[in-house]
């Protein structure tokens, strides 16, 4: 294998490893946003009910 061919293979490997995590991250962000939109009202209601407004104060 020549130097040019090895460099091309190296670039392809680098591009493949950077493109796949970016596409996976954007796909999971969409799913997480949809799930968080549904769950956040429930969490906010329960946190108001059970959590003290300022946990660092006594009383």
Swiss-Prot record:
The lineage of its organism: Eukaryota, Metazoa, Spiralia, Lophotrochozoa, Mollusca. Acts as a neurotoxin. Expressed by the venom duct. This is Putative conotoxin. Disulfide bonds: none annotated. It comes from Conus imperialis (Imperial cone). Belongs to the conotoxin A superfamily. GO terms for cellular component: extracellular region. The keyword Signal applies. InterPro entries: Conotoxin_a-typ. It is found in: Secreted. Keywords: Cleavage on pair of basic residues, Neurotoxin, Secreted, Signal, Toxin. Pfam families: Toxin_8.
């Amino acid at each position: 294998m020549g130097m040019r061919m090895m460099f091309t293979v190296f670039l392809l490997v680098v591009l493949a490893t950077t493109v796949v995590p970016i596409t996976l991250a954007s796909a999971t962000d969409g799913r997480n946003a949809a799930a968080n939109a549904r769950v956040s009202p429930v969490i906010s209601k329960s946190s108001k009910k059970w959590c003290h407004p300022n946990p660092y104060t006594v009383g």
